Amino acid sequence: GFQGVALDTLRVSTLGRGGSDLTAVAIAGAIEADVCEIYTDVDGIYTTDPRIEPKAKKLDKISYDEMLELASLGAKVLQNRSVEMAKKLNVNLVSRSSFTPEVEGTLITKEENIMEKPIVSGIALDKNQVRVGMYGVTDKPGIAASIFTSLADENINVDMIVQTVGVDGKTDLDFTIPTTDWEICKGVMEKFQTQAENIDYNEKICKVSIVG
């Protein structure tokens, strides 16, 4: 399930992370299966990470879009591509544990199939974040765009962005990046040292996202 063969060239390709799940969904869609069960090491999709919050509740159902949102924000139960394909092929997914198969998992389905939808579906936590703070930045058009363009050129995904209202020609700019991009980001930010009075980094943060 982790590799595929191109029909025209017969070349073997590795599908990458989540390839087995992706293959299962594709087969389920092709044979028009009622459901595709994905077995992991947890009983299903929880309202938040049960390893951090013991009172987290297992969800009976969640929509494709909400599952994709949780996954993009740090929840690591299901891989994004498998959920995207399930939505495209209209395949109902069930996430459940291979260690406790007697426990009903979580159904990932179309939103209209969920009769009683909670206001908040889940809370995603991402501890692999670094806050980059630029203080006393020259407040003129194009500075922020230049910074973010340089980061994008290095394939650094900038997430949360906060910029203060300019005072006396100066402004403060804060944004978050993945911890894995920290060292590369430092190299990029060195080019903008003259544009700010101070640049600092804080890796002791956690991003909390509410999905609903």
Question: What is the meaning of each model-derived region?
Answer:
Residues 1-212:
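C-terminal catalytic "cap/lid" subdomain
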